[in-house]
C-alpha cells in the first residue's frame, strides 16, 4: 500500500469514527477525544486504542463493537483490533473545540 493510499484509508477511518456516539453524549467519540491511536499496517491490519469518559461506561461493549464493525467496513482495512486503554486518563481537554462548545464547556 502506498503512503497516499494509507492516508486516504486513514481519513476514511476518521470519517467513520465520527459516526460512532456514546448514547448518553451528543458528540461523536472522535471529537470527544476518545480515540488515542489509529495505526494502519501496510497489509490493512488496523489497531485502534480508545478510552471512555469513565471506566465504568455502561455502553462500553456496544461502542467498541460499533467501532470495530464500522472500521472493518472501510475498503482497505483487512482486520481491526480495538484496544480499550485508560492511560492517559481522559479529561475534557482532549475534546475538540467544537465538542466543548456543543457540551457547554466553552
What are these regions (language model features)?
Residues 1-106:
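Domain-level signature for proteins that mediate thiol-based redox and metal-cofactor handling
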Amino acid at each position: 500500500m502506498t503512503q497516499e493510499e494509507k492516508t486516504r484509508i486513514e481519513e476514511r477511518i476518521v470519517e467513520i469514527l465520527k459516526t460512532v456516539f456514546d448514547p448518553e453524549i451528543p458528540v461523536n467519540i472522535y471529537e470527544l477525544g476518545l480515540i488515542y491511536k489509529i495505526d494502519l499496517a501496510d497489509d490493512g491490519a488496523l489497531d485502534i486504542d480508545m478510552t471512555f469518559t469513565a471506566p465504568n461506561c455502561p455502553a462500553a461493549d456496544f461502542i467498541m463493537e460499533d467501532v470495530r464493525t464500522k472500521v472493518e467496513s472501510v475498503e482497505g482495512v483487512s482486520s481491526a483490533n480495538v484496544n480499550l486503554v485508560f492511560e492517559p486518563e481522559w479529561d475534557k481537554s482532549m475534546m475538540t473545540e467544537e465538542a466543548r462548545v456543543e457540551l457547554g464547556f466553552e
